[in-house]
């Protein structure tokens, strides 16, 4: 009799909050390539808040601005749930909401290695 292989580690489920369709699609593809599952994707504040409060996911990637609105309410909801998150921004750290400037930040445009590094940083806390 051969021993059974240990069960595969389930892929972490990611919430993607990004208002630009092409960037959102790129993120979803990159996450799949890294072995993650996209649990939900949101393109505007209402979708993002609904997902942040109710969806089942392990980690989130937040665009700093959703159609010109700061993403702070979504970050607040994630903090309330104890869910780690990474910001994605083209503005640099100065564009981050003040209370969240210590969070991992993925600078746009990003590459696969940078995405993986930031997600690992967020997961480890």
Where are these regions (language model features)?
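Non-catalytic signal-transmission and effector/linker regions of two-component phosphorelay proteins
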Residues: 1-13, 111-125
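Conserved acidic carboxylate
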Residues: 18
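Two-component/phosphorelay signaling modules centered on CheY-like receiver
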Residues: 21-40
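Acidic, metal-coordinating helix/loop segments flanking the phosphotransfer/catalytic sites
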Residues: 41-59
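Acidic catalytic/metal-coordinating carboxylates
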Residues: 44, 68-73
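Active-site residues of response regulator receiver
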Residues: 63
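Hydrophobic/aromatic residues positioned on beta-strands within the core alpha/beta folds
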Residues: 86-88
């Amino acid at each position: 009799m051969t021993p059974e292989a240990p069960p595969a580690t389930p892929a972490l489920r990611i919430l993607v909050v990004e208002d630009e369709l092409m960037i959102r699609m790129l993120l979803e593809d990159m996450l799949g390539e890294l072995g993650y599952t996209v649990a939900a994707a949101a393109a505007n504040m209402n979708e993002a808040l609904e997902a942040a409060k109710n969806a089942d996911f392990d980690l989130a990637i937040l665009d700093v601005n959703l159609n010109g609105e700061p993403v702070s309410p979504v970050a607040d909801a994630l903090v309330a749930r104890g869910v780690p998150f990474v910001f994605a921004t083209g503005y640099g750290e100065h564009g981050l909401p003040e209370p969240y400037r210590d969070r991992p930040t993925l600078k746009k445009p990003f590459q696969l290695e940078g995405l993986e590094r930031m997600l690992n940083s967020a997961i480890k806390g």
